[in-house]
Regions:
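Hydrophobic hinge/microswitch elements
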Residues: 99-100, 108, 118, 174-218, ...
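Alpha-helical linker/hinge and terminal dimerization helices associated
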Residues: 13-14, 35-57
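Secondary-structure junction motif
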Residues: 149-175, 195, 239-243, 247
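Acidic, Gly/Pro-rich loop/turn segments at junctions of secondary structure
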Residues: 87, 98-151, 204-208
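A short LG(V/I)-centered, amphipathic sequence patch enriched
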Residues: 11-28
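Short coil/turn segments
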Residues: 24, 69-74, 119-121, 135, ...
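Central regulatory/effector-binding core of bacterial HTH transcription factors
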Residues: 61-122, 183
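A late-sequence structural motif
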Residues: 76, 217-256
Length: 256
């Protein structure tokens, strides 16, 4: 009776007679044969899906969406992604770069799983310090013995926190240089200094291939000038395998 009721319900749902009933049993109607083909095909597809999901239990896959600060993407991210893709080749990466304040905004909009920002930003969920690097004064070797006041200061636009830090150091050292040359990119700034065009204040992330002279800076009270890099994420999304593995890997490779 239970099976008979199920068959009747199926016919009612489909609006068609699927079986011819007789004392000898039931026979499929043309509609019933079509329904059987669909049911069998669906059952095969369901079994295939079960097998694929079982295989994926031990495989990290899916899509990982990251937005990264421009400077981090240039000087650190390639090494991190090379290691990550070697470990997780089945993950599809969606990487975008932006200014740190915009990276945070994108994360707040839930458009990405993770954001890597430079500088101090308020964020109430997952936040990991990846690196705290010194901020340095740089000049070319040909200008090593030239007093700073006689050299052109090369200015660079940055976030308010970093600009305030540089302004404080300049004030404490009674220096008020006019930025006769102002650029908007860190690598451009370093290239200008390398070419002997003047001196500048930059975070050390960009100095791996700088062949001039650099010296870490300190405030008058002895506190070093530093620049921090953070990994930000939503805690609920850190449970996704591809996100969890990226967090693990970038932390293992961080310089903090």
């Amino acid at each position: 009776p239970t099976l008979s009721k199920r068959l009747q319900n199926m016919e009612a749902d489909l609006g068609a007679a699927l079986f011819l009933r007789s004392k000898q049993g039931v026979t499929l109607t043309p509609a019933g044969e079509a329904a059987r083909e669909v049911i069998q095909r669906t059952a095969r597809e369901l079994n295939t899906l079960r097998e694929q999901l079982q295989m994926r239990k031990d495989t990290i896959c899916g899509t990982l969406r990251i937005e990264v600060s421009i400077d981090y993407s240039k000087y650190r991210l390639p090494q991190v992604l090379a290691a990550y893709t070697a470990q997780c080749p089945d993950v599809t990466l969606r990487v975008s770069t932006n200014h740190s304040r915009d990276c945070l905004r994108t994360l707040q909009d839930s458009s990405v799983h993770l954001a890597i920002v430079r500088g101090e930003y308020d964020w109430d969920e997952g936040k990991i310090l990846l690196e705290r690097e010194p901020v340095c004064l740089i000049r070319s070797r040909e200008n090593a013995s030239v007093p700073l006041r006689e050299l052109r200061y090369i200015g660079r636009d940055s976030d308010p926190e970093h600009m305030s830090m540089k302004a404080r150091w300049l004030m404490e050292h009674k220096m008020e240089p006019d930025a006769q040359l102002n650029v908007d990119g860190l690598s451009t700034c370093v290239a200008m200094v390398n070419a002997g065009l003047g001196w500048s204040i930059v975070p050390s992330i960009c100095l791996n291939y700088f062949d001039g002279i650099s010296e870490p800076l300190f405030f008058a009270d002895g506190t070093p000038l530093t620049r921090s890099t953070y990994l930000l994420y939503r805690k609920r999304e850190s449970e996704l395998p591809q996100v969890r593995e990226f967090i693990r890997m970038v932390c293992a490779m961080s310089r903090h």
